[in-house]
Structure formats: C-alpha cells, structure tokens
Amino acid sequence: MSKADLIVGLQWGDEGKGKIVDHMAQTHDYVCRFAGGHNAGHTIVIGDKTYALHLIPSGVLNPKAKNVVGNGVVLSPKDFIKEMEQFDNLEGRLFLSDKAHILLPYHADIDQARERMKGDKAIGTTGKGIGPAYGDKVARVGHRLGELLHPEKLASKIIAFFEMNKPVFDAMGVEMPETVALLEELEGYRKVLAPYICDTTQLMWKIIDEDKRILLEGAQGTMLDIDHGTYPYVTSSTTVSAGACSGLGLNPKDIGKVTGIAKAYCTRVGNGPFPSEDMGKEGDRLRENGHEFGTTTGRPRRCGWFDAVAMRHAVRVNGVDQVALMKLDVLDGFDEIKVCVAYEFEGKEIDYVPYDLEDVKPIYKSFPGWEKTEGAREFDALPETAKSYILALEEMIGTKMGIISTSPEREDTIIR
C-alpha cells in the first residue's frame, strides 16, 4: 500500500502551490484536490504558456497523471467546464466525486448581497459563492454532483429548495432563479460532466491498495482555514492537512510526506488581520516585483514580510515535513529584509498566534539583502546573504526548506 504525499499552503493563500504541484506531479500517478472552490487559483508557467487553474488539479499538465476532484470541493459546473476547454483528452484522466457539492449562480448572488449588507465589516470574499455553497452543505440542503445523473430527483429537490428559501432571497434582495431555466442549464452541465462523475472514495482506496504514487493538493492557506485561520476573515472550508482525509475519504494513516508552501515574504487578499503587512513603499515594491494580483479577481494583494510566528503555527497544525520557499527572487535588490519574529500583544511579547490577531503588533528582525537569486538552481549558487536568510528561517520555524523557487519557470527550482 502506498501513502499519499500532501501539499498545503502555510500562509494566506497564493503561496505558489501550483508550481510545486506541477513540479511534483511529474513523478506521481494521481493528483487529487480535496477542498475549496473556484475562488482560489494556481498560476503555472511552462515555456511561453501560462495556465490559470481554479478547480482542475494541477496534474492536468502532466499527460501521464490522472486527476481527482474530491468530495470536499464545491464545484461550479459552468466555471469547471470553461476550465476544461483549455485541455484535450481528459476522459480517463479526470474523476469528479459524486459527493462534491454543486455551486450554482444564486450562491454567488447571495455571497455578493451579504458582502453589501455588511458594509465596512465585509470579509472581502471573492463573491464567487463559495461560502453560501458550503453553507447549504452544512445545512443539509445542498445539491451534489451525483444528482446530475438523476435529473428528476434533482429537479424535485431544487423546486423544494426554492419554495423553502423564497423569504431568504426576498429579504436579501436577491432575485430567485427561474426554475425551468436553471434545470435546463443543469441538463447541459450533465451532458458534459456525466462521464467524469464517479465514487472517488472507492477510487482513492483502490489506487492506494495498488501502490500508485498519489499527490494531494489543497487550496488557499492555513491562515484562511475555517477553524485555524483568522476567523471570521477566512474561507468556508478546511484548508489544513487534516482536510485531505475528510475531503477525499482517506484516513490519517494514508498520508505520507507533507510539504508546506510559503512565500519568502507574505501576501493576503481581502480584509482581515495581517500583522506583518507593509503599507509603505517596500510593500508596494513587493507587490510590483512579485506581480501580486489575484488569479481569480485581479485584485492587488496586500504585501508584507515573512511572519515566522504564523509560520510556526502553520507548520505544527499541518505536521509539515519540509517547506517549499517560493518567490525568493522577489526579494532581489532589497538592502534590508525584515522577518516578524514575535508579536506584541496586550503589553507583552509573545511567540504564538493568539485567539485574535487583530490587536497584535509585529516585532521584526532585519537581515541584509542581496543582489540576485533569480534563476538559481543550486543552493550553493545563491548569495551568502540569501543562504543565511534561508537558514535563519529554518531555525525559526523548526523545519527544513527542502525546495526553493527562484522564478516562475518550472526549471528554476532548488532541491535540497
């Protein structure tokens, strides 16, 4: 029996998981997505082509790899089908869980209405409907992909759902969809997606028993986890390593090596606490150097320095075996590089993540910068100050930086 390798984000998402999944997918038979929706995105550069993936696992770019979308995902059929159109020959290479929940256009309408109602207290969601779709799942009124294979049953459920929820739609000022039109839309989705829908839990057990090499990929990052993140400024799913089990039907003994992904600095999209955010010129420089604009929304990302306190928290929560440090080259040319090494909280210095990050202040340690790391493919090729920075981060978080990325290109990756 094999064990599945796991990739998980350690910050607030957008860490660069796509490049590492693409890199590791070259040696794996299956790549499996366990949570999230199309609010998150991977950007992968191969040669002169750039791929933006939101729902399809990154293994799709390896013609030998097969791809699984697990039951922990909420899937927008419209957006998924659009994403499928980028690729040929997906049949036999793509498997969608019949237990994954369907995200429909009215979920996005509700999401956006809620954000408007909150005013300056808005969370800053992508407005894609992820929260309402997960809300329906937890409230036991959601619709699952397997129901697309049984149109009559799905139709009766949708009619009953709208009858029950009409007062909710009216109260929020959201126009309720026309039932017949929605059912016709779903029938179109069924024709495209039906060949890919199956019991992926049974598939996962089978490929583990067959000793296949399996890679599990999450979405977003630990600090956006519904339980362990900066609640309520979080996503609605489990983004940490434990979510791979519930989101794919695995047990903890099925999990092998855990690789955590982190940038050499920090970014965040949307509202919520961000202790090491730099609101000045250096934050702007990080954003420009790193092209920090959302894959899904195009929104500029908030930028700041590496937060070693939050990183230690994430490493422990996820049981990380090694860290992949991304975008080291974005720090090229800085005279000084800061790292948040502790927080000031209620008049005291602390080295852990408290209940609420809103009121903490960062305590920084400065490191000398370097001229160039871009394109380096060997650790010894890095400037001495860059190597010292990496070794210092390792000591702070208690885990080895086993992979270091020095550009968006697939080949510009250091393996230690």
UniProtKB/Swiss-Prot annotation:
Its main location: cytoplasm. The keyword Magnesium applies. Pathway: Purine metabolism; AMP biosynthesis via de novo pathway; AMP from IMP: step 1/2. Mg(2+) binds at residues 14, 41. Substrate binds at residues 295-301. It is an enzyme of class 6 (ligase). This is Adenylosuccinate synthetase. It comes from Sulfurovum sp. (strain NBC37-1).
